[in-house]
Amino acid sequence: MIISSTNDYREAARRRVPPFMFHYADGGSFSERTLERNVTDLADLALRQRVLKDMSQLDTEIELFGEKLAMPAVLAPVGACGMYARRGEVQAAQAAENKGIPFTLSTVSICPIEEVTAAIKRPMWFQLYVLKDRGFMKHVLERAKAAGCSTLVFTVDMPTPGARYRDRHSGMSGDYKEIRRALQAVTHPFWAWDVGIKGKPHTLGNVSAYTGKAVGLDDYVVWLGENFDPSISWKDLEWIRDFWDGPMVIKGILDPEDAKDAVRFGADGIVVSNHGGRQLDGALSSARALPSIADAVKGDIKILADSGIRNGLDIVRMLALGADATMLGRAFVYALGAAGKAGVENMLDIFKKEMHVAMTLTSNQKISDITRDALVDLSKL
């Protein structure tokens, strides 16, 4: 099929990846209203077209936490990413490196930290959940540190699992899930060969290394459910701040007061995020939450944003709302599931070209030029 957008990659991934994995990435929580609004609230923002400005020296590069990025985007942490392509985390990390941006490895990745870092030269980022098992947290932080991970992304919006009803329908969870997955694999032969057979082991590499036994997909949901910690507070993060030498980013901020708390805590960055609509359905979209957060803490802390970004225009919109950079999740997973490393590289090329178009036609030559002036206030029309 012809590929020219994230939507095309989504459709290609839907055809190639079995439903239990496709819908795990594609779905949200409850009725998926926040998932929907993440996309529509961002896409509905009108860009302010300006013309007859010299855009011949247009530049999408930025510096973030001492790293140079070819564009203001980071590949976000996605659990079980290695189930979308053979050793998928490695392929995605290599694609990000080739295109000049960081890759973030999830705590619950298929490929362990050491396998991914051995495959790339650029230091990757590492994401950590708040878990009851502090021994695991310390263990995995030590490994990330030893492997040269540059930035820690600490996810704080999962003190409890979200109610992801679609997973029960798709076979990711629910009755007879093993049989349903096996039948789905039979009807998706390319995936069954490339990932199902040649992509083994299908265990959570970082968790298995700690427990000393294989922790697979069936154990994944149970292990996470048992280890989410609803008692977590800012005080519990202090030992992590003391232990981690590099930049620390708090992911899952939707309220200005929480953003101010992150500044007081000493975090280097925040990610304005609702977990892609996978946690609290009914929460604000990131596009709606971002402006007030930027008003509260812009300049005091680096602001990243995710959830709902489907093209390069959306990146420009997030920057105009106050973000310093963005994180891309579903978009790269669709591309990875559809075409592996080459798909992710092509998707990033598409996003960069779309950014060039948006920046040229809004007359913003550098990323630092993009402000809310790049948007049209439709309420005044």
Curated annotation (Swiss-Prot):
Record's GO cellular component terms: plasma membrane
Gene Ontology molecular-function annotations: FMN binding; L-lactate dehydrogenase activity
Catalytic residue positions? H275
According to its UniProt entry, one GO biological process term is: lactate metabolic process
Give the residue range of the signal peptide. none
Family according to the record? Belongs to the FMN-dependent alpha-hydroxy acid dehydrogenase family.
Which protein is depicted?
L-lactate dehydrogenase
**Origin organism of this chain?**
Actinobacillus pleuropneumoniae serotype 3 (strain JL03)
Gene name of this polypeptide: lldD
